[in-house]
């Protein structure tokens, strides 16, 4: 499937235990963008990493200590942060919390293998509405 359904219902959408006190739920995606809900247990760590995707993170609840390219800030409900492609970033959550991550392009590693195999790149480049 090259995109998610138009509507996503939290009580019907799979929540994946990704280990280390983290759980992830896909909210929606296509070939351009992806939104994911992530639960952090108290004390959970999202270890520093980099990726080619732009990322915006919105804090739904809890307190997160975000480090982006060596700068650490404390973010709480209603706060957000932006990570440019290849920015070194990570977060700890001393309270437990929930955040929404948005990626562009989507994180292929969060999807089943082959999710975008049927995308016609030439068609995408000429008219993205046709994909």
Residue ranges, per PLM feature:
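Ligand-binding loop in jelly-roll beta-barrel domains
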Residues: 85-109
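Glycine- and acidic-residue-biased ligand/ion/polar-headgroup-sensing regions
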Residues: 53-64, 69
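A cytosolic small-molecule/anion-sensing beta-strand core signal
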Residues: 60-61, 76-77, 95
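Histidine-centered metal-chelating micro-motifs
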Residues: 45-47, 65, 81, 85-90
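Short acidic-glycine-tyrosine-enriched beta hairpin
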Residues: 70-85
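A short, N-terminal "cap"/entry segment at the start of jelly-roll beta-barrel domains
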Residues: 1-32, 116-131
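Anionic, Ser/Thr-rich low-complexity intrinsically disordered regions
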Residues: 66-68, 100, 108-116
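Conserved short histidine dyad/triad with adjacent acidic residue
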Residues: 36-50
């Amino acid at each position: 499937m090259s995109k998610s359904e138009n509507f996503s219902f939290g009580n019907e959408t799979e929540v994946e235990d990704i280990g280390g006190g983290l759980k992830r739920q896909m909210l929606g995606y296509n070939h351009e963008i992806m939104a994911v809900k992530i639960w952090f247990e108290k004390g959970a760590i999202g270890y520093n990493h980099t990726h080619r995707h732009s990322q915006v993170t919105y804090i739904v609840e809890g307190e997160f200590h975000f480090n982006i390219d060596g700068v650490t800030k404390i973010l709480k409900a209603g706060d957000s942060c932006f990570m440019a492609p290849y920015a070194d970033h990570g977060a700890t959550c001393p309270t437990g919390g929930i955040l929404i991550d948005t990626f562009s392009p989507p994180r292929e590693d969060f999807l089943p293998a082959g999710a975008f195999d049927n995308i016609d790149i030439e068609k995408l480049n000429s008219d993205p509405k046709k994909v």
